[in-house]
Amino acid sequence: MRLPIFLDTDPGIDDAVAIAAAIFAPELDLQLMTTVAGNVSVEKTTRNALQLLHFWNAEIPLAQGAAVPLVRAPRDAASVHGESGMAGYDFVEHNRKPLGIPAFLAIRDALMRAPEPVTLVAIGPLTNIALLLSQCPECKPYIRRLVIMGGSAGRGNCTPNAEFNIAVDPEAAACVFRSGIEIVMCGLDVTNQAILTPDYLATLPELNRTGKMLHALFSHYRSGSMQSGLRMHDLCAIAWLVRPELFTLKPCFVAVETQGEFTSGTTVVDIDGCLDKPANVQVALELDVKGFQQWVAEVLALAS
């Protein structure tokens, strides 16, 4: 039986790969997509998500979400993904539109209609998820679990300690981690290992139309290089859903720093139990890289 999922995203070049996997992995049933400001503005992430859905002829409803963090000024990662968020490929025009309600309400409505609890997957800042949990707490029993790409037990990638998705909206992340729902965190500890090799990247143009499109995007992606390999951060959250045996997880207490002058956005991961607090997150710490690369090749071969 396919696993029903809702995907909250901020496309983003590596988001595009994660979306492809969510659509084409035969184990998954992607029922709803929502967008959030992150890699670029929410207007751009929404446009990019709709372009991808049209490219794959995927009839999946999409709702536009939060344009700004809960309390902070927005920031983006255009230096990594290009000003449009998906630089490098010219998508054809279409007339698709997002749903007419905010993302968190679209998630609420879809959860309440679902015949069974649904897995939420968040691969951008957690603003929409925090709004859902704070404004619609009655939805919690309908959430099977939340799988996120975000955080780190060690080094950051936008500050010395903070990972980008958490650092964009630390208050939202703090709200989510305090919520009591089941959380799996695929952070930089594993996503920095999730590298597609130059040899594999070179095969993409001959793979299928998705391979050609992704190869064009990857030439503008600045998380690695075509010569040294590219990190597939967001794809790890989808990979865990399909191939959890590729990941080593540890239950930990995780809190988000919201006050520090130099540490705001840091995920404080208590690996050794120093704080004597109950674990609230399953934290991915190791990845079977070869197994991950093999799975990516398999799923992208299906993305025609």
From Swiss-Prot:
Gene Ontology MF terms in the entry: purine nucleosidase activity; uridine nucleosidase activity
Work out whether the entry's keyword set contains Cell inner membrane.
no
- Residues annotated as the enzyme's active site: 233
Q: Which PROSITE patterns match?
A: IUNH
| Enzyme Commission number, as recorded | 3.2.-.-
Q: Which InterPro entries match?
A: I/U_nuclsd_hydro_CS, Inosine/uridine_hydrolase_dom, IUNH, Nucleosid_hydro_RihC_nonspecif, Ribo_hydro-like
Q: Which UniProt keywords apply?
A: Glycosidase, Hydrolase
What is the superkingdom listed in this entry's lineage?
Bacteria
- Establish whether keyword Membrane is in the entry: no
Q: Which GO terms describe its cellular component?
A: cytosol
Q: Which residues form a coiled coil?
A: none
Which GO terms of type biological process are on file? Answer: purine nucleobase metabolic process; purine nucleoside catabolic process; pyrimidine nucleobase metabolic process
SUPFAM superfamilies under this entry?
Answer: Nucleoside hydrolase
Describe its function.
Answer: Hydrolyzes both purine and pyrimidine ribonucleosides with a broad-substrate specificity.
Q: Which HAMAP family match?
A: Nucleosid_hydro_RihC (MF_01432)
Protein family membership: Belongs to the IUNH family. RihC subfamily.
Q: What is this protein called?
A: Non-specific ribonucleoside hydrolase RihC
